């Protein structure tokens, strides 16, 4: 028995460092396999959840307000998202994203990984999911990458996403759109305050599954067990079909400082005779919700700016 425990510990330690992306070894200050900080969830409560299967073919998206589930357990606040992932396709890379919405709020996710017997195997607290700045194809978001190695014989893993009362007391500082734009085009970064997103129980979380060949967190017992077989978990839901595309909603009005930044940049571009740049600034400002950029552009071109 001592030999078995030592071998398991060795596998878990070897997988730790690859499970925390983008940090040095000196910065590792928690162990994903240590699930003692995770809420204790009775097996009966887990079996009542509907676990949505996720495979490599697409990203699974859940709107918590409408697609989340209730789990009345101490340490969990608001709706949860529950997914099942195939464990017989090799090592896995799970990317979980929580998008910041237009009201400047965001769901701060915690993730509990369970093996096919519904035994907690890894815990990733909300601090693991860090703020990522918006890009060409992505919005402001909290995001984390989890690399997992299912033990031999595991058929599926379970991924439970939730938030806590402690998370709701915290906030996330975002990057102001004007700063993001200036950074993207190589302009000087304006000295304006960044918006702050409050943490809520609502939001959109997305889970993407890929196979992975690097070291990772071992999930499930390494050796055979005389225990009971896999637990049948409620009714496994079919993957939810993606909704039909809808026309994008009109952007929320931008902050005064952001509006002023774009208006000044438009005036400066017109004054220098760079109308193309002014038009690009106008398009970007209106995309972000500006209500005065167009009139600023017109008056500047007419010599009234």
From Swiss-Prot:
- Which keywords appear in this protein's UniProt record, sorted alphabetically? Periplasm, Signal, Sugar transport, Transport
The membrane spanning regions, by residue number, are none
Q: Which cysteines are joined by disulfide bonds?
A: none
Q: Where is the signal peptide?
A: 1-22
Cell compartments where the protein resides: Periplasm
A GO cellular component entry from the record: periplasmic space
Any single GO BP term: carbohydrate transport
Q: Which domain of life is it from?
A: Bacteria
UniProt xrefs under InterPro entries: MalM
Question: What's the stated role of this polypeptide?
Answer: Not yet known. Might function in the uptake of a still unidentified substrate.
What is the similarity comment for this entry? To E.coli MalM.
Its name, as the record gives it, is: Maltose operon periplasmic protein
* Biological source species: Salmonella typhimurium (strain LT2 / SGSC1412 / ATCC 700720)
